[in-house]
């Protein structure tokens, strides 16, 4: 635990931020895309930071449970992301090409599947550039190849389990720390709302800060780790 960390039985205060145990504010799960077969993986690396993903650039929570448990964003032998999944209307994009030949970056070109009668197959091109340089950076470019306007939902889902490499390889731990949620006080004293955009926050607060997503974990030694 650092000198800037204060704790109560229900809250953790760290560098001006407030965390509470994740079970106090459960987040509705966003369905993952189930693949009928095990997906090949690509790996990019920068010093002690490495990223194992499928060829689309996704880390699917379903894949972790169905044959690819080693995928994720890792640093210092800990997995800081166990889900990073881009979906088109709840479906996986269709891969056209991907390469990780540079070693520290991943380039992906994919397109959209057919979505009922609203979106024809291969109407939209999606280019993903994922780079490791002390952190993970991603740029997404979306191109419309039709002659008309199209409407569709493009989503990216994140999650972090903060397991170590031994757990990834199948070893069990007798005890684990706890997952945390970053929250902000609401106008009503004693209540909190999620900063992650799932629950509304006070209007004056939302306009004064950048939109962000923070996933956190408190280890058995009291230290707090964050994925931001």
Regions found by a protein language model. Give the residues of each.
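Terminal accessory carbohydrate-recognition/targeting modules of carbohydrate-active enzymes
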Residues: 1-228
């Amino acid at each position: 635990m650092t000198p800037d960390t204060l704790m109560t039985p229900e809250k953790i205060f760290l560098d001006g931020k407030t965390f509470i145990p994740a079970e106090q504010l459960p987040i509705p799960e966003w369905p993952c895309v189930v693949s009928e077969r095990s997906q090949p993986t690509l790996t990019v690396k920068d010093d002690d930071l490495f990223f194992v993903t499928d060829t689309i650039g996704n880390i699917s929570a379903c894949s972790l449970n169905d044959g690819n448990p080693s995928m994720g964003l890792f640093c210092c032998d800990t997995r800081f992301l166990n889900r990073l999944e881009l979906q088109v209307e709840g479906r996986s994009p269709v891969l056209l090409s991907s390469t990780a030949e540079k070693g520290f970056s991943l380039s992906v070109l994919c397109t959209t599947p057919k979505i009922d009668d609203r979106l024809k197959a291969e109407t939209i091109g999606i280019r993903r550039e994922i780079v490791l340089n002390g952190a993970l950076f991603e740029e997404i470019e979306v191109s419309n190849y039709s002659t008309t306007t199209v409407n569709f939902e493009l989503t990216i889902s994140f999650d972090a389990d903060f397991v170590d490499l031994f757990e990834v390889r199948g070893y069990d731990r007798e005890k684990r720390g706890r997952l945390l949620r970053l929250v902000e006080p609401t106008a009503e004293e004693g209540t909190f709302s999620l900063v992650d955009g799932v629950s509304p926050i006070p209007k004056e607060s939302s306009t004064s800060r950048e939109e962000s997503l923070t996933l956190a974990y408190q280890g058995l030694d009291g230290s707090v780790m964050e994925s931001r």
